[in-house]
């Protein structure tokens, strides 16, 4: 067992009675860091099928091979099926293709861990035309969550227990977001606000993206609370490579800080296993730190959560292009989306409606 991180509460071992035998798990960003370690721990708990969603299919396949060969997996779960599916979080179209493949090839889905993410220190546009860190950390994850929601619900109905959607969040959302000082104006949209380069702050955009994730979680959690538990957890300061894009004058001190006080990847991943496997319905719609629900995350009074609750669906509409100049709109809690959850089928075939309630 790894030693506890200095200055951070220790994360206890996953309970010995935690078991997900026969279950299917998807981990985005599953080829490295927290995603890879979370996948390993899911497998040691008995997951029968693991899907690593990775931008590079080659690196995903390498990670899948490494997991199959890992001593703990070979000992506890040698017959697990481990696959790598391509998913570029920078691109809505890739998210749609990934979701279509899962819906076509996967009959049951018990856990979706939305873990993939990055820190971007300069203003960049995604392949879908939005600010990159928001696209990667938020928007595409919400797309696949909604696309796979019917499958998660049907799996819950078949098993008689809730399925799970867990997001890797961050406590930076509490103190380092820009929205408390610079609220989204009533004339703007969420996409418009974060796409505006004038609103980009390289030191705080990661925190902003995690604030948006937390708001998504609160909304998604209301869709089918008895069937799909949706939650969000901060793994703490962890010894990963997420700082790779930082400038050298920040990368060096952050590296020293992570090395001296950060949790090991094994311990950090246990926080994700806790919310995705162990924690119950009391965590639906909640943000957790150190395996405890953080009450502040659901009682924020600054602009963004309030904005989310009052904005009509049409305020989150945007034109996208991919190949043909088709219009693809992001509409909040569109009734066709809600209907698709109940009636089966997808609302995204020609144009997709992303239920953001924003």
Swiss-Prot record:
Coiled coil: none annotated. Its EC number is 1.1.1.-. Keywords: NADP, Oxidoreductase. InterPro entries: NAD(P)-bd_dom_sf, SDR_fam. It comes from the Eukaryota. Residues 1-22 are annotated as: Disordered. NADP(+) binds at residues 34, 88, 115, 206, 210, 238, 240. The active site is at 206 (proton donor), 210 (lowers pka of active site tyr). This is Short chain dehydrogenase sor7. It comes from Hypocrea jecorina (strain QM6a).
């Amino acid at each position: 067992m790894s030693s506890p991180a200095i200055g951070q509460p220790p994360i206890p071992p996953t309970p010995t009675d935690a078991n997900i035998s026969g279950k299917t798990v998807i981990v985005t960003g599953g080829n490295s860091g927290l995603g890879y370690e979370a996948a390993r721990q899911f497998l040691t708990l008995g997951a029968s099928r693991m899907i690593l969603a990775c931008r590079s299919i080659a690196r995903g396949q390498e990670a899948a091979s490494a997991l199959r060969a890992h001593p703990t997996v070979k000992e506890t779960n040698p017959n697990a099926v481990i696959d790598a599916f391509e998913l570029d979080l920078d691109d809505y179209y890739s998210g749609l293709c990934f979701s279509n493949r899962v819906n076509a090839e996967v009959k049951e889905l018990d856990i979706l861990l939305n873990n993939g993410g990055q820190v971007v220190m300069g203003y960049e546009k995604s392949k879908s035309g939005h600010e990159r860190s928001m696209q990667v950390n938020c928007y595409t994850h919400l797309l696949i969550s909604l696309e796979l929601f019917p499958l998660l619900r049907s799996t819950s109905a078949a098993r008689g227990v809730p399925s799970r959607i867990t997001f890797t969040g961050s406590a930076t959302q509490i103190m380092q977001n820009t929205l408390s000082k610079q609220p989204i104006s009533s004339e703007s949209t969420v996409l418009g606000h974060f796409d505006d380069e004038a609103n980009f702050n390289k030191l705080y955009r990661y925190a902003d993206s995690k604030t948006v994730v937390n708001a998504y979680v609160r909304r998604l959690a209301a869709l089918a609370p008895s069937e799909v538990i949706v939650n969000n957890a901060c793994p703490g300061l962890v010894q990963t490579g997420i700082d790779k894009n930082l400038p050298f004058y920040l990368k060096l001190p952050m590296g020293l800080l992570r090395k001296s006080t950060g949790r090991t990847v094994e311990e950090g991943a246990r926080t994700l296993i806790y919310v995705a496997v162990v924690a119950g319905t009391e965590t639906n719609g909640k943000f957790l730190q150190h395996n405890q629900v953080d009450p502040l995350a659901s009682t924020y009074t600054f602009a963004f959560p309030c904005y989310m609750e009052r904005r009509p669906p049409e305020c989150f509409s945007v034109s996208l292009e991919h190949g043909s100049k088709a219009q693809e709109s992001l509409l909040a809690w569109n009734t066709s989306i809600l209907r698709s959850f109940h009636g089966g089928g997808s609302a995204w075939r020609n144009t997709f409606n992303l239920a953001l309630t924003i």
